[in-house]
Structure formats: structure tokens, C-alpha cells
Swiss-Prot record:
This is Defensin ARD1. It comes from Archaeoprepona demophon (One-spotted leafwing butterfly). It comes from the Eukaryota. Disulfide bonds join C7-C32, C18-C40, C22-C42. It is found in: Secreted. The lineage of its organism: Eukaryota, Metazoa, Ecdysozoa, Arthropoda, Hexapoda.
Length: 44
């Protein structure tokens, strides 16, 4: 998967809707993951 940003408000590269942002970039979808679900990962 491709890390594109953060799911935490105020963090660097914050995205309010990880799945929608990933789709906008041409990925199949996305989800918040890693420690405490802080990162936005796009499905590759």
C-alpha cells in the first residue's frame, strides 16, 4: 500500500477522508492504519 498522509487532525498531510482522497488520486481505495490508525494508506 501507499502512504499518502495522516488521518489525525492537525498532523502533517492530514486528510479528512482517506478513502475518498485515495480514489481521487487513482487508487482503488484507502484506509487508516498503523499505530492508532494515524496513517492514511492507499490500496495499490
Amino acid at each position: 500500500d501507499k502512504l499518502i498522509g495522516s488521518c489525525v487532525w492537525g498532523a502533517v498531510n492530514y486528510t479528512s477522508n482517506c478513502n475518498a482522497e485515495c480514489k481521487r488520486r487513482g487508487y482503488k481505495g484507502g484506509h487508516c492504519g498503523s499505530f492508532a490508525n494515524v496513517n492514511c494508506w492507499c490500496e495499490t
